[in-house]
Amino acid sequence: MSKKKILLLSDDLRMYSGIATQSKEFVMGTIHKYDWVQIGGAVNHPEAGKIMDMSEAVKNDYKVNDAYLKIYPTSGYGNPESLRQIMEIEKPDAIMHFTDPRFWIWLYNMEHELRQNTPIIYYNIWDDIPDPLYNTHFYRSSDMLMSISKQTYGINKRILSKYNYEDWQLDYVPHGITDKRIFKIKDKGDTKFKEFEQKYKLDQHKFKILYLNRNIRRKSPGDVALAYKHMMDKLTPKQREECVFVFHSAPSDENGTDMRAVCQTLLPDYPVIFTHDHGGHMNDEEMNFLYNSCDVYINMASNEGFGLGSCEALHAGTPIVVNVTGGLQDQCGFKNEKGEYLTAEDYVELQSNHRGTYTNHGEWVKPVFPTNLSLAGSPLTPYIFDDRCSFEDAGEALLEWYKIGAKERKRCGELGRQFVLNEGKMTAKHMSESFIKNIDATFENWKPREKYTLEVV
């Protein structure tokens, strides 16, 4: 029996954005089941207008003899004309799109035309409440919505419950990490690992705090630096010699700040490693080395859809400090009064745990609850909460991780690793299995839109 073909609209899966890496994970994890075509977006894509047939490479790398993968690179995220042309050539059985809905308004304007013959699937996320009712028509333009966070699942279900969406049309499918990229290194005496630590001066410190996020305002890089300072201020001079703040991001970004200036001015006496000074971009092996070398990962983002960095850190067995917002909540292992992990269904009523409704959490995380919820917005997204936690609270969390020592951090990190591998279902295998389940459910249950009838009056 021939395989169904899926047309994916997202970042080019050969790129390095979070959208791209996750696109690659679920495409490669399901390519034995489906044929894939991608309209691969990028800013000023260098291969725009070409057709890249990746089938043979996938057959060799993934040992799938009937693999089919073609990428149509494009600058931006495509347009109606190119979509119609590619659909005429490839004749896909379903369309899947992935990333912020505002990039797909042109697609939603075509939804009735497309859904007469082809179902639309949306792998979606939203950073925070209140429920974005301004997204209602975007959500209604899809036949199946897979939610990347439990908070997003609650949003999708509350909004779409008014429009007779059935259970099969909504599901919680968190991002998944493959152990081919990120895993716990058991032998840290390995020569390559040691050489990596020496190259980045990581071998000179015993307690390394990792910031691995974009240098943009909502990621709060300055607050992370102040949290580090808060911790260091409470240590003795001897203890401070063991510690370092590792900044793996662009040191300066117009969408964020100049972190060199921040650190030189506000914490001039405390060591900071800017990884870009020692080599810049890292490949998959080096990224895994970085996660394994550091002792704690921190994310204080005020809005965070999922938080790939903290999830990858847990896969390496590295404990975390995170702001309780968006998808970061799902990595905390919050439990209810019965000691049961919160489910996606719980979030239909809960909405968000950013107010600390539940405080029982996994040992692998020091969650920092927001001290201020500010209503932000823009003309296209009129309202969304901005969850700000204090750098003092985050600094206290870092201090706790320092004080418990390396042996206890290792134990807690391993508990976190087991959580994301099992109950959290944040592996590439779990994600791919969920994709297959939901795509098959779409093909089984989808009903085409009725065609328009034009009558002469």
Segments predicted by a language model, with ranges:
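A short, active-site helix/loop in glycosyltransferases that binds the activated sugar's phosphate group
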Residues: 132-170, 177-187
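Aromatic "clamp/platform" in nucleotide-sugar-dependent glycosyltransferases that forms part
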Residues: 302
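N-terminal subdomain of nucleotide-sugar transferases
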Residues: 1-56, 90, 457
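Conserved donor-binding/catalytic core segment of Leloir-type glycosyltransferases
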Residues: 8, 202-219, 228, 245
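C-terminal amphipathic helix plus adjacent low-complexity
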Residues: 359-457
